[in-house]
């Protein structure tokens, strides 16, 4: 079990600091501790865009990463002593935060993913509010703050990531006023009237105001935060509009000025572009088309299995296009890759059952023996296999009901150096603000989604190349390194030491 808060606070109040000038604080470490069949443990690299985005910055700046190592720690397994202190893994300094089964159930599956996640995604599923979940969220956030405090050198920069850790900035500010603290939210920040439903709304805003810079994907999220800061905490806030990577908002709290900005995250587009040109990837893409029966058109969906992603919307649209004869069943297929997600949360279990029932219905109605019209895989795909699917597909379907950014859309574009393919993209993704030459659709308008898919399937080669060239220009110019650098530059200017 993790030490009590009192013990850790004593450590943090001492005059000893860590030696890391730059600290990332995230729910997960960039590696997971895995138990092997013989009972021993090993570290395995975590997939994910956050690791890709921040690892180069960590390496350049003598960085450390604070996060959960991916195993539940209930104090019964003595071989988890490896988690007792900092770990050097592939030349990165890692500081594990130990979480018990109860912590995961209440802080992560409970408050983070059954309260905050649905609230921040426009209440597609009703948020659940439980006092014990909130209490655990506070407790775990305190442990993350204390771990960050121990890792950070005097005057270091600490970058806190995402909705699971919204109380950490204030907690860390109280422990270590010498630090420069940034926070970035990777999911949408909700409209004011929705956020006001939250019983602990003031505490969340106060937690975020502990940062020197609070970042969102879009200007709208930044504006909502400024309004709530003024209404709930009484900050004196700027009244002008917030721009993208410019025209920052400000909230004045006592003697401190908190900068608020919009920083749309991106992907490592150069690396994806390079990988997609690889001869082996190209060969695998051709094999995929052969394995699918060499259809004329392949539509692709790649998502975590989440109710925000609109998987059911695209399947229903495809089913109706088949029924209406606007798409031919013998030359068009859908491939849906659905990565398992939060499988112990009831709403996710229900979603999986619903999607698999929907796939079965479509294949039963329109497929043939040995030739389904929907190919559905409920498992993660290795990176190279995923890139091959991007290269092989003719239309990428990205239809979330709400999404902070959606990096899959940008990954697809980065992989299409051949200027082939088409992107059908929900207006309710952050990416839609940048990828204006996609086929933009409203996922709540089924007829509009059907029209968008049909238009993408039937585009001329010239029109498709023109659209994809424009999309690639945007994605290749605004990559993940530019995102991280723009945030950190703004953070350096936000702290009093950088103002002068």
Swiss-Prot record:
SUPFAM superfamilies: UDP-Glycosyltransferase/glycogen phosphorylase
Pathway: Glycan biosynthesis; trehalose biosynthesis
Keyword Nucleotide-binding found: no
Residues that coordinate or bind UDP-alpha-D-glucose: 48-49, 304, 309, 407-411
Keywords: Glycosyltransferase, Transferase
Substrates-to-products reaction catalysed: ADP-alpha-D-glucose + D-glucose 6-phosphate = alpha,alpha-trehalose 6-phosphate + ADP + H(+); CDP-alpha-D-glucose + D-glucose 6-phosphate = alpha,alpha-trehalose 6-phosphate + CDP + H(+); GDP-alpha-D-glucose + D-glucose 6-phosphate = alpha,alpha-trehalose 6-phosphate + GDP + H(+); TDP-alpha-D-glucose + D-glucose 6-phosphate = 5-methyl-UDP + alpha,alpha-trehalose 6-phosphate + H(+)
Keyword Glycosyltransferase: yes
Alphabetized InterPro entries for the sequence: Glyco_trans_20
E.C. numbers: 2.4.1.15, 2.4.1.347
Pfam family, one: Glyco_transf_20
GO cellular component: cytosol; peptidoglycan-based cell wall; plasma membrane
Entry's Gene Ontology molecular function annotations: alpha,alpha-trehalose-phosphate synthase (GDP-forming) activity; alpha,alpha-trehalose-phosphate synthase (UDP-forming) activity; manganese ion binding
Gene deletion effect: Combined inactivation of both glgM and ostA is lethal, potentially due to accumulation of toxic levels of ADP-glucose. Combined inactivation of otsA and glgC results in a loss of alpha-glucans and maltose-1-phosphate (M1P).
Regulation: Activity is increased about twofold by 10 mM manganese. ADP, at 10 mM concentration, inhibits the formation of trehalose-P by 70% with either UDP-glucose or GDP-glucose as substrate, but GDP, also at 10 mM, only inhibits the reaction with UDP-glucose (50%) but not with GDP-glucose.
The protein's enzyme class: transferase
GO BP terms, alphabetized: trehalose biosynthetic process
Sites where the protein binds D-glucose 6-phosphate: 28, 108, 162, 342
Annotated site location: Involved in alpha anomer selectivity: 117, 187
Assembly notes: Homotetramer.
Function summary: Involved in the production of glycogen and alpha-glucan via the TreS-Pep2 branch involved in the biosynthesis of maltose-1-phosphate (M1P), and probably in the osmoprotection via the biosynthesis of trehalose. Catalyzes the transfer of glucose from UDP-glucose (UDP-Glc) to D-glucose 6-phosphate (Glc-6-P) to form trehalose-6-phosphate. Is specific for the glucosyl acceptor (Glc-6-P cannot be replaced by either mannose-6-P, fructose-6-P or glucosamine-6-P), but any of the glucose sugar nucleotides can be used as glucosyl donors.
PANTHER family: BCDNA.GH08860, TREHALOSE-6-PHOSPHATE SYNTHASE
Family: Belongs to the glycosyltransferase 20 family.
Protein name: Trehalose-6-phosphate synthase
């Amino acid at each position: 079990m993790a030490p009590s808060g009192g013990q850790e606070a004593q450590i943090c109040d001492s005059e000893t600091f860590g030696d890391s000038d730059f600290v990332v604080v995230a729910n997960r470490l960039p590696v997971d501790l895995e138990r092997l069949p013989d009972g021993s443990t090993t570290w395995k690299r975590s997939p994910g865009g956050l690791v890709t985005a921040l690892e180069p910055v960590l390496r350049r700046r003598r960085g450390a990463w604070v996060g959960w190592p991916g195993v539940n720690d209930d104090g019964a397994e003595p071989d988890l002593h490896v988690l007792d202190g900092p770990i050097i893994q592939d030349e990165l300094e890692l500081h594990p935060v130990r979480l018990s089964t109860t912590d995961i159930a209440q802080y992560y599956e409970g408050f983070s993913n059954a309260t905050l996640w649905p609230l921040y995604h426009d209440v597609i599923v009703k948020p659940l509010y439980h006092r014990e979940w909130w209490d655990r969220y506070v407790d775990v956030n305190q442990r993350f703050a204390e771990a960050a405090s121990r890792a950070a050198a005097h005057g270091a920069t600490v970058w806190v990531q995402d909705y699971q850790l919204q109380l950490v900035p204030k907690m860390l500010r109280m422990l270590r006023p010498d630090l420069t603290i940034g926070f970035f939210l990777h999911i949408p920040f909700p409209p004011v009237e929705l956020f006001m439903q939250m019983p602990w709304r003031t505490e969340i805003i106060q937690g975020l105001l502990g940062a020197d810079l609070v970042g969102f994907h879009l200007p709208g999220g930044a504006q909502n935060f400024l309004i709530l800061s003024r209404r709930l905490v009484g900050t004196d806030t700027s009244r002008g509009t917030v721009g993208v990577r410019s025209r920052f908002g400000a909230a004045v709290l006592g003697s401190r000025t908190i900068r608020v900005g919009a920083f749309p995250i991106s992907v490592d587009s150069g690396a994806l572009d390079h990988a997609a040109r690889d001869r082996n990837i190209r060969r695998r893409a051709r094999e995929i088309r052969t394995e699918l029966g060499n259809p004329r058109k392949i539509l692709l969906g790649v998502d975590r299995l989440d109710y925000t992603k609109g998987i059911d919307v695209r399947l229903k649209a495809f089913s109706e296009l088949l029924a209406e004869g606007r798409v031919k069943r013998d030359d068009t297929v859908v491939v849906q890759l659905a990565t398992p997600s939060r499988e112990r949360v009831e709403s996710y279990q229900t979603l999986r059952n619903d999607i698999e029932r929907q796939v079965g219905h479509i294949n039963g109605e329109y497929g043939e023996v040995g030739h389904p019209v929907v190919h559905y895989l409920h498992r993660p795909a290795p990176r190279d296999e995923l890139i091959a699917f991007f290269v092989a597909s003719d239309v990428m379907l990205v239809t979330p009901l709400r999404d902070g950014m959606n990096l899959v859309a940008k990954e697809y574009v980065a992989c299409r150096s051949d200027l082939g393919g088409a992107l059908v993209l929900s207006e309710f993704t952050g990416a839609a603000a940048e990828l204006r030459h996609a086929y933009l659709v409203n996922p709540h308008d089924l007829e509009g989604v059907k029209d968008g898919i049909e238009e993408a399937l039937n585009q001329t080669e010239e029109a498709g190349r023109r659209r994809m060239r424009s999309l690639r220009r945007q994605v290749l110019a605004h990559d993940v390194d530019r995102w991280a650098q723009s945030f950190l530059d703004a953070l350096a200017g936000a702290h009093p030491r950088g103002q002068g």
